[in-house]
Structure formats: structure tokens, C-alpha cells
From Swiss-Prot:
Gene3D superfamilies: 3.30.1370.110. This is Ribosome rescue factor SmrB. It comes from Buchnera aphidicola subsp. Baizongia pistaciae (strain Bp). It comes from the Bacteria. It holds the Pfam family Smr. Residues 98-173 form the Smr domain.
């Protein structure tokens, strides 16, 4: 053994002695599988597409409908005339309410699309949109947007017992 080998062995001995009480770190990181992340991404994208479908119906420019400001109502099919009568006298109570006053047109349209998506998912029949007074921009636009959506059966300016002329009550055809 030469001098450098003995020095090296002493250094190694001291090194092992210093690190003898040290234990290996336990790995506690949980790695998500790629499949789980893909499934989550697919669910998120599916939900976004469903909301965009309803938003597309609202922003479609196929036809223009004008409404009389005294009595705002809409009926998709004449077969639902008795439903409109019940809607006018206040027999239907909204199962979900959306308040859009204070929002601009695009935000209100997106929120209305989300509301219609929720109504489809949870099979809600009656909903209400509160547009407020303001400059009557949303008051004029919401009936037009609702009339463009194929699932809306009928709507009517809310009866006095539900909030006067600041909201619209509408009925949605269930998907089943």
C-alpha cells in the first residue's frame, strides 16, 4: 500500500462514518397517471363544448324577431298554447334564476348559454332571467336570444308576483 491509497481509505472511512446515520429519503410524491389527466381534460372540453353549443344558438343571426314592449311573449308551436296561458297567469314557478343586470351583452349571452346548459343537464322545466331596468338593452335582446334557441318552448314577461317587468320566465323542452 502506498501513501495515497492509505490516505484514500482513511478518507473513505471518515466519509462512511459521517454518513452512517443518514437514511434514505422516502418518496412521498404521488404521480398521476396520464389516463386520469386525459379523462379530466376530455370532461372539461366536453362541458365547454356543450356551453358553446347553447351560446351558438343564441348568437345565430338567421332571423330577426321584434316584440311588442307591452306584452313580451313567445310560443314556439301552437300546440303549446295552453302552456303559455298557464305561464301568463303564474302557474309555473322558476326552478332556477339567472341575474344578468350589470353584465354586457356578450357576458349575458354566455351566462344565458350556461343557464340553458344547466337546465338540460338537470332536466329543469322552468327558468327565469332577471335583466333589470337599465337602458333596456338586455330587455330587448334576451327575448330575441331565447326565441332562437330550439329548446325554448315559450316565454313571457314575468307576472307581477315574480318581479314585474324586470325579468322573463321561460319554459324549456326536456331532452327526454
Amino acid at each position: 500500500m502506498n501513501k495515497s491509497d492509505s490516505l484514500l481509505s482513511k478518507d473513505l472511512f471518515l466519509l462512511y462514518q459521517e454518513f452512517s446515520e443518514i437514511r434514505k429519503i422516502k418518496q412521498d410524491t404521488v404521480f398521476q397517471s396520464r389516463r386520469f389527466k386525459l379523462v379530466q381534460d376530455i370532461k372539461i372540453k366536453k362541458n365547454m363544448y356543450e356551453q358553446d353549443i347553447h351560446y351558438h344558438y343564441l348568437s345565430c343571426q338567421k332571423f330577426q324577431i321584434s316584440f311588442n314592449h307591452d306584452s313580451i311573449f313567445y310560443l314556439r308551436n301552437k300546440n303549446y298554447f295552453d302552456v303559455l296561458k298557464k305561464l301568463k297567469i303564474g302557474k309555473y314557478v322558476p326552478e332556477i334564476i339567472l341575474d344578468v343586470h350589470g353584465l354586457n351583452q356578450d357576458q349575458a349571452k354566455r351566462k344565458l348559454g350556461e343557464l340553458l346548459n344547466i337546465c338540460h343537464k338537470e332536466n329543469l322545466f322552468c327558468a327565469s332571467v332577471i335583466h333589470g331596468h337599465g337602458r333596456n338593452i338586455l330587455k330587448n335582446k334576451i327575448p330575441i336570444w331565447l326565441s332562437r334557441h330550439p329548446s325554448v318552448i315559450a316565454f313571457y314577461k314575468i307576472p307581477k308576483k315574480f318581479g314585474r317587468s324586470t325579468a322573463i320566465l321561460f319554459l324549456i323542452h326536456s331532452s327526454d
